[in-house]
């Protein structure tokens, strides 16, 4: 849980004696355990602290801060603000801390209107601002008066009001991107290795002859030289190829790199924080009032910039990404706090966010207004006096209906044309994920299954499936079925019979026919990218149809038995299943049967029978893997140890032998996949770069005969 730290405003007189000490806290109470309280009592010797539920926004410019302080202290005269720790409005060329009561050389003073969090480095944790009337100092000409920005006060008032409602529970991952061009080379990296005592380290020097093995993986690296050092938490702290170095842990870097001749030229430097939220937010923020003193809007409504445009913030439903140029202690936590508050303030109606988007289906697309149709419900603040309660969440009067969702947001249909005034619910949302999403209809929806479920909380028999068969392409709910695409319909249903009613859509009877139904999973499975598809197919160990492509699992050659008979199919990025459907003439009940045989396996391009290569003392090496006492060895190996094996080319005898298989491979890194495949095969068969072409081909045909 993030705690917004208190702040101190100290007003002093001509003798620098305390006149007022304001303790600003959004919690409205003194935190006697805080460093600030200790500072006020032990160092300032303040007898009393005036506690106020106020907060100085750390994103203010110094001129805005001065206006805020004038208003806070009730001053209508020139003031000078300063700090005992940092320079604020004025600074010396040599960065000596400015104090208006102990001036040195006026000529070396620089005045700047910077942002508070930039000039006061630990403002997030320990903010103390000193204020003096200009006439009480030896340099009254340095003072000025600023009017407070009314928008800042308005924003602060809303913050104070809503602060108790904010959920500031979140976790943070950080990544430093400090990249330098260096002259370390191989000798410099070896010296770092020698100085390292406690951290896990991997130093790789490769060429075209050798490949490094670490743990269960080949280290396939295009760099001839690579040094990686991890910290105690297992995070990559330092990485270098001799020419450039990436520093994620500055402290560790300074400990290990002591070469006085080291040359470093910064190429890139920033820090990315990824904040994971306990409570979701709305990723699209529209700032409706003046907030330029905090954020700057961009053309993309889920991206914000700080007021100085040096910090970028990307919003998502469950996390926030913040990129900063320079390290400012806890600034990522402070901006997360501001984002959560602004999201809460400007998007209160988005408590109904549950229907803004569900996977690929958008509420605004399905239930949208057009020139003569007003189907999108509006949010209302109260019920009419003459409304009758239909259920605990639905109310009706002769002219209006109101639905109250689980977040107590009230929706009603108010069509200026007087047509779409009946509140109903989108069936597809409810059938896919049991979500009651309101929409406006021409006629009462009280008779529909979805209305009965959402309003009266009565679940209907979901085993009843409509005998009407949909054309392929629409998302299929649990009460529907659809045809397969024409190509696959002909393939799967060759020789099978099906009868339809006269309208050719209503299923009359069949002893077995392949159709598409929804996946029987607790949640929708959505595959957005090719990577998603590959991961899904390999995890399920089943086939997937996507467009005109059929995806087989990587290890499909090992087994195509009963457990590998499922066939999935992708419709609008949602995973569905291919099943057999049965229906008798005298019944409307549709029955489903899992596939007895997946004919797609006949086309799997790599069917190789398992063969034993070597066996000794209960250890068996096969083309399928390494077995210990009959069990496949799959234990993760330690990455603390490094071994080497001979490199392979992707154009040799083995590569040409497997070329008929490789042309079917779908991967994001084709060359690395082929090299890994060949390395595994060559190691299993004990082949080396010195093996002749005839010897290599003979071994491949013996153990990996392609059918």
Swiss-Prot record:
Cite the InterPro entries for this sequence: Poxvirus_early-TF_lsu
- Alphabetical UniProt keywords: Activator, DNA-binding, Transcription, Transcription regulation, Virion
Q: Which domain of life is it from?
A: Viruses
Q: Give the main localization category.
A: virion
Which Gene Ontology cellular component terms are annotated?
virion component
Per the record, the GO terms for biological process are: positive regulation of DNA-templated transcription
What subcellular compartments does it reside in? Virion
Q: Name one Pfam family in it.
A: Pox_VERT_large
Q: Which GO terms describe its molecular function?
A: DNA binding
Its family remark reads:
Belongs to the poxviridae VETF large subunit family.
Q: How does it assemble?
A: Heterodimer of a 70 kDa and a 82 kDa subunit. Part of the early transcription complex composed of ETF, RAP94, and the DNA-directed RNA polymerase.
Task of the protein: Acts with RNA polymerase to initiate transcription from early gene promoters. Is recruited by the RPO-associated protein of 94 kDa (RAP94) to form the early transcription complex, which also contains the core RNA polymerase. ETF heterodimer binds to early gene promoters.
Q: What is this protein called?
A: Early transcription factor 82 kDa subunit
Q: What is the scientific name of the source organism?
A: Molluscum contagiosum virus subtype 1 (MOCV)
